[in-house]
Regions:
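Bacterial N-terminal signal peptides that target proteins for export
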Residues: 2-14
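Bacterial N-terminal signal peptides
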Residues: 12-22
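Boundary at the C-terminal end of the N-terminal hydrophobic targeting segment
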Residues: 24-32
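Divalent metal-dependent phosphate-bond-processing catalytic cores, especially two-metal-ion Mg2+/Mn2+ enzymes
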Residues: 33, 45-57, 61-73, 85, ...
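Short, well-structured alpha-helical segments
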Residues: 53, 57-60, 76-80, 121-132, ...
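An active-site-proximal "capping" alpha-helix that borders the catalytic cofactor pocket
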Residues: 59, 101-115
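His-Asp-centered metal-binding catalytic motifs of divalent-metal-dependent phosphohydrolases/nucleases
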Residues: 76-98, 102, 106, 126-137
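Active-site-proximal helix-loop elements at catalytic-domain edges
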Residues: 112-124
């Protein structure tokens, strides 16, 4: 009996030591660690007012909300990584200078950012697929891709869509100026609504579409049909 108790104590000690080693500096990053790393990366590098860090946060939150409303289960690792990194190719050195399509360039580049963070690389292909189809004119397939796509599309409509485009206007008369910003909003109003595919996303299209329509109507009335912008 004493021998058995001694063996049990030794085994417990070995388990405690193993746990201590696992939490040491040589351990692989935990799930929370890779998410914190990715979030901090986006916060430091994605500074554009229209498609920077705050846009990533909105896309992630809205995609989760839409999926929950539709009772669709998502792989949150895939959604989180794709939402926070989907516009990476809009920023140098990962893209920046008018790449062929930032969705494709970003999908190819994202592995370099995730590698070494502790992200489960077996899910990298799904992240790439979601990034590749996040724009409203693309056709998403997997649930994570669908809800990121719809969240990103809806972020071009409503008051937030106005805020994003307005933030791009050059105050010194450069590109884009006020009239061009209006054309961008009109393009979004014309092209984006029909591309939202999920039931919960479709339910938000009408209110956001109407809000953007009202804004453009009132802005036109107050600016001689946009000539005095």
């Amino acid at each position: 009996m004493r021998h058995r108790n001694r063996m049990n104590r030794l085994l417990c000690g070995a388990l405690i030591a193993a746990c201590a080693l696992a939490t040491g500096s040589g351990a692989a990053p935990a799930a929370a660690d890779w998410r914190a790393t990715v979030r901090q990366f986006a916060k430091e590098h994605f500074l554009n007012p229209a498609w920077g860090y705050s846009h990533c946060e909105r896309d992630y939150a809205l995609a989760r909300s839409l999926a929950a409303a539709d009772h669709v289960a998502l792989d949150d690792d895939v959604l989180f990584a794709a939402a926070y990194l989907h516009d990476i190719a809009a920023f140098p050195p990962w893209g920046g200078d008018e790449p062929p399509d930032h969705s494709d360039v970003g999908a190819d580049a994202v592995g370099k950012v995730l590698d070494g963070t502790g992200f489960p690389l077996g899910k990298l292909a799904a992240v790439r697929a979601a990034i590749r189809t996040h724009m409203y004119y693309r056709d998403p397939l997997a649930p994570e891709a669908v809800y990121l796509h719809d969240a990103d599309a809806l972020d071009w409509l409503g008051a937030i869509g106005v805020a994003r485009i307005s933030a791009l206007v050059d105050p010194n008369g450069g590109d884009p100026d006020g009239p061009k910003a209006v054309r961008m909003l009109q393009d979004n109003l014309r092209e984006v609504p029909a591309r939202v595919v999920s039931p919960a996303g479709r339910a938000l299209v009408g209110p956001r579409q109407a809000e953007l329509q009202r804004y453009l109507k009132e802005l036109g009335e107050e600016s001689a049909e946009f000539r005095n912008l």
